[in-house]
Amino acid sequence: MFVDLHAHTGGISTCCKVGADKILETAKEYGFDGLAIANHYVRNYFTEETYDSWIEKYIAEWNLCMELGKEYGLRIFKAVEVTMEYDKRLHMLIYGADEAFLRNNPLLCDKSLAELYGICKENGCALIQAHPFRSGATVQDANFLDGIEINCHPNYQISYADRVMEIAQKKNLMVTVGCDYHADNYRPCGGMFLPEELKDGKDLVNYLLTAKEYHFQVHEPQDDRIYQASFRRETQEILA
């Protein structure tokens, strides 16, 4: 199945231009079989006093997407995009998170990368650095990452796919692909080709952490080119 591993909805991500229903409707129209809903988790969305009520809204948005997914025939995976408070250029995608994870681990954005990675490992989650070169950012310490993302958002000018795969190969990291879709530009057609039997976030994490080869499609924002590729932790190959 073809899954965009990085999508937002307007119910939580205030920079997203439309609500969950339109996000899923558009994904279905563009041929996706599933989405990872990774709304922003950023410090200016809450205070320590309002965290509990805000996180319930975050969870409710996940659940709304799960219900809409049934209507549209889309597999929905729960994910989180954490903006690191110590350097707001750094956004970390968490796959495998669920309601208990968010309720039991507050203020993730205030953690160091090492602390966040430790929390993810304790809870069976995978930690991926999103758009690792945006705004002059660099790939962070691979000891505290499971992977790095090829990001197809049209506002980012280039996906850095070759660079991401080269670094991932050297550092034995996984590669994920997502469009970071906010409905603020055209709908890119980038994502991962995943086994149909993946039913939820834990299945997704198990696959991402154990697969030796990943197959995906990149929608290159620089020239609107769409191509498929595969990545092995030792080798990488452009298919077509």
Where are these predicted regions, by residue range?
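Binuclear metal-dependent hydrolase catalytic cores centered on His/Asp/Glu-rich metal-binding motifs
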Residues: R89-N123
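An N-terminally biased module of ancient metal coordination in phosphate/nucleic-acid-related enzymes
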Residues: M1-K78, T83-E85, N143, N185
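Conserved beta-strand positions in the central sheet of alpha/beta enzyme cores
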Residues: A36-I37, I128-Q129, E149
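Charged catalytic cores and adjacent phosphate/nucleic-acid-binding surfaces used
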Residues: M1-L5, T9, S13, G19-E25, ...
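Short, flexible loop segments at the rims of nucleotide/cofactor-binding pockets, characterized by
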Residues: G11-T14, W54-I55, R103-L107, A126-I128, ...
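Surface-exposed amphipathic alpha-helices with a cationic face
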Residues: F2, K28, M66-K70, S112-I128, ...
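Active-site-adjacent beta->alpha loops and helix N-cap segments on the catalytic face
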Residues: K57-Y58, P106-E115, I158-E166
